[in-house]
Amino acid sequence: MLSKLLRLGEGRMVKRLKGVADYVNTLSDDIEKLSDAELRGKTDEFRARLAGGKEDLDDVMPEAFAVVREAAWRVLNQRHFDVQIMGGAALHFGNVAEMKTGEGKTLTSVLPAYLNALPGKGVHIVTVNEYLAKRDAEQMGRVHRFLGLDVDVILGTLTPDQRRAAYNADITYGTNWELGFDYLRDNMALRLEDCVQRGHHFAIVDEVDSILIDEARTPLIISGPADGGSNWYTEFARLAPLMKPDVHYEVDIKKRVVGINEAGVEFVEDQLGIENLYEAANSPLISYLNNAIKAKELFERDKHYIVRNGEVFIVDEFTGRMLVGRRYNEGLHQAIEAKEHVEIKAENQTVAQVTLQNYFRMYEKLAGMTGTAETEAAELHEIYKLGVVPIPTNRPMVRKDQSDLIYKTEEAKYIAVVDDVAERYEKGQPVLIGTTSVERSEFLSRQFEKRRIPHNVLNAKYHEQEAGIVAEAGRLGAITVATNMAGRGTDIVLGGNVDYLLDRRLRQRGLDPIETPEEYEQGWHEELPHIKAEVAAEAKDVIAAGGLYVLGTERHESRRIDNQLRGRSGRQGDPGESRFYLSLADELMRRFNGATLETLLTRLNLPDDVPIEAKMVSRAIKSAQTQVEQQNFDIRKEVLKYDEVMNQQRKVVYAERRRILEGENLAGQAHQILVDVITAYVDGATAEGYSEDWDLEKLWEGLRQLYPVGIDHHDLIDSDAVGEPGELTREELLQALIADAERAYAAREAEIEEIAGEGAMRQLERNVLLNVLDRKWREHLYEMDYLREGIGLRGLAQQRPEVEYAREGYDMFIAMLDGMKEESVGFLFNVQVERAPSAPTVAAQAAPAGLAAFAAAAAEQAQAQTGGVATKERPAVGGLRAKGIDDKAQPLTYTGPSEDGGVEVKRSGGGTPSTGGTRKERREAARQQKTGRHAKRR
């Protein structure tokens, strides 16, 4: 029945979900009679039933949901509504549950999380920021812990051991940033015990549209220092001023692209003294040339960037702010530095990357929650195979959505906004003002200060403090100015948010749901009636004033973001109102049909301070938003189309890497690699002609670079050891060389073990294979990026770029694997090996005042001297050191989507942002540059 349910139409799906909720209701009476211990015992009962194999999760779902509903009532004093039961069932079936703001998505997620955690494979609940992950793990975790499940949270400050413990919990909360980078780091680990994740079973993504759609254009990238190419940046910065537009290259200012023509190519070839710029060996030079021309023609000093203290800083096009720590990607920033004759900062090299699309598609089952997914239903289905199920509201929506008001100038618009807010403030109505940037929110704040209107400003930077402001944004006379993305995850409840106010009061008393759970639970139930009474009394006054008024100061390019803002008002059947104030200077109006509207207003001869309300304008705005949404969808599809090629290669490499990491004895794998390499060499030498035509001298010369060859090819031909003298077949040659290589490998193993002890060769094999695979993979990522950059030109030759990219990428991948094998054999035979110094004993020292401090100091000393403290779970590394293999870890840079829709950069260890950028970093920023929207504010 349940499998059929997913194939039904939307209306029938909702009807079936209602059936699930009704069934859960029939179980409630029996569940309510259970004691706390009996309720908790249900978890073990469910697990036993599932382990028996006769029932699956679908079978136990109704009873499990009834148990969770009762536990939530006893612990949180919150009982799931029927619509929340419906939402929980939709999530369990692997859908996106579209639940309007205020309908209790967080509480809904407890249902499928508990159910899917029963098999013990782990459930990940993904939030948009760490504050929400921590808050939900604490509050919703109270229900799970009451039922006997382990709950933990992944935070950026955790150590690898703490992360491993968190992932081993039944339910793990975290951000897409932390989960994605843990996956990449696991596939860079040099020891199995350094891996932290344990698989991808089931994920529930909160704000699924934001994470899987808005942030999906920016891949997660880990990068490290690369070899610098500053000389080439300088050389092309010298050439660019000598080249002329329309002679050597074409410039499209609107699309922000440049194209080098034939005369330009010839000019560069003459200047550099090379025959063909487009030869494979010269392919990197094309990128330097393009960036030099872009830096010259498309980026103006003091407009797009400024130079201060010998550094180039990007300027935000919308806010005019200097973006400290942000750099253009793909070598463009270095080209601008060369143009301005300042120090050229090193470019970073990508060492690992994955798109959010491909990360989340690894989960066996994926589900999501949001208040606004209907406009993106097609994309969610096409890319993630997720259906969108609109869940009915618990109470009818009575919010009034007023028509947009359009003003001719931005100044007139903001004057009208302030007047409207002042009028609402006088009667005590709470107002939430949505802006599109920090600069605009601060501008409004200054206007309110001039009018002496008390208010709060939210800029999506300090989530914990902002959650407190949002929790009180529905109180009498509260005026809140917020960027569109600020304060997500906290309900604006008329009169104040009971849960938040109660939690704050308990924390002020020193109580914590994790540190002091029993006292916290007791205090919760004691204080709850008082807080509820206070909030209810104030809510009556707020309702009398008209409820929450949401005022948008600009239309977002996505209808979904506008709907999110509107959805903050009118929750749970409360009264409310919303309106957008627009001007012809707004970004969306400028990009689409702004001139037409301006002509209309001019003909009407209306004063600047008189707005118009016209259906034509509303239609134009909707049309513009639809166009932008489609453009962004196409961009994401294009990213995914090319990344799918890399994804298949990534799977192969990471699977091979995992086998190496997990393999106790790699002798068999090393032997096969040795045979493959010898076979490839022999095939290359014997591919053409008869044996007398083979260049065995060249073959032997190549083999001697790999291992100490112990036989002579003349002896093979002249003796009858492998057949008739003078007659040498390819098979005879191959078998003789394989036998010789095996002899040499056995001798090498004896040599290594004499130096570093028994088992040292196995350790060397693991170290070499991991090191070489990682290095060749990094080089491959670099080459694939170059291929991706230039592949678009294949369209001019009537070829499909994505097909050519897949074909050539496959050839490059096979070549990379062959190179990895060859290099590994060379390292295994030739790397210098010595015994690593044994772990020194920690010198005795006087214990500091605190025993914990003493233990920490001793552990730190041991860590510094041995590279890690040996434990039962993590034994000490063997006594082997290989030159060029066991190098120190390089500082890493992490690049991924930020919550405000831009790109965020972090250094390993939580340091300052990187001063360099990879060629792939901030891919979304590059696209924004091409469409006239430069790198956004962090």
UniProtKB/Swiss-Prot annotation:
GO terms for biological process: intracellular protein transmembrane transport; protein import; protein targeting; protein transport by the Sec complex. It is found in: Cell membrane; Cytoplasm. The keyword Membrane applies. The keyword Nucleotide-binding applies. It holds the Pfam family P-loop_SecA. ATP binds at residues 84, 102-106, 491. Coiled coil: none annotated. One of its GO terms (cellular component) is plasma membrane. NCBIfam families: PRK12904.1, secA. PANTHER family: CHLOROPLAST PROTEIN-TRANSPORTING ATPASE, SECA INNER MEMBRANE COMPONENT OF SEC PROTEIN SECRETION SYSTEM. Monomer and homodimer. Part of the essential Sec protein translocation apparatus which comprises SecA, SecYEG and auxiliary proteins SecDF. Other proteins may also be involved. This is Protein translocase subunit SecA 1. The lineage of its organism: Bacteria, Bacillati, Actinomycetota, Actinomycetes, Mycobacteriales.
